[in-house]
Amino acid sequence: MYNSSNIIDYVIDAWEKLQEQAPLVQCITNSVAANYAANVLLAAGASPAMIDNPFEARSFTEISGALSINVGTPTTEQIQAMQISAKTAHEHDIPWVLDPVGYGPILKWRSDMVDELLQYHPSVIRGNASEIGALAGSLVQSKGVDSTLKSDEMFQLAHNLLTKTSCVAISGETDYILSNAMTCIVKVRGGSHLQPKITATGCALGTLIAAYCAVAPVHLATIAAHIHFAIAGKLAYDQAQTIGSFNTMFMDYIHMMDANLIEQYACIELISDD
């Protein structure tokens, strides 16, 4: 049985393992996010590798601790690499995270490709409310790749996705995490309103989830990554209220995270999953 206290203990344990193991995370991500996501992983203690070449995908996925796939700016070659790596991860029980950026009727090509990737059962699907809602089959519209709906309007629909994945994370002002391994929904609060003003923060969160998945059970890894991000965002905003300075402090706190900060600042709520 989970409660707020023991979840925080599990998160601290996951963070400690992340520091000890520095897992190798293969990232097939978009051209806007690659540099930022790699730096977030390095700051958090993981080892990123941005291998998105279909000729190298299989061999590299086989040696990775986890895989992160983000469909933000897909190319034909990237899609081939995604399919190969997702299949390889599925065959070798390597955890992998799917970030269906922009999923919906407007961007049909990528959305069809995401539908194909679901056959390889991602360990985690992470997205904003509109992406998760669209993927779950609701009749929502997505404004580009930005969410037009609140997370709390979508989390019930996310249950539909738990037949395709072990865990669903809906990112927003408040984050919601649902999993087949829990009888509750975990709400994670924190962060800052400046985070959406910085490109690639959501994409980087997806890669951080993958890093934690390499060292902890999927549902706890997803919670840990969101708490890590939320605390870094809160503490960064306490120090800096302008975007440039906030971005620097945010990366600093991703790196400076420790057990004491997690215990002191993690803000979660468990709600009934009826």
Swiss-Prot record:
Its EC number is 2.7.1.50. Substrate binds at residues 50, 200. It catalyses: 5-(2-hydroxyethyl)-4-methylthiazole + ATP = 4-methyl-5-(2-phosphooxyethyl)-thiazole + ADP + H(+). Pathway: Cofactor biosynthesis; thiamine diphosphate biosynthesis; 4-methyl-5-(2-phosphoethyl)-thiazole from 5-(2-hydroxyethyl)-4-methylthiazole: step 1/1. The keyword Transferase applies. Catalyzes the phosphorylation of the hydroxyl group of 4-methyl-5-beta-hydroxyethylthiazole (THZ). This is Hydroxyethylthiazole kinase. It comes from Acinetobacter baylyi (strain ATCC 33305 / BD413 / ADP1). The gene is thiM.
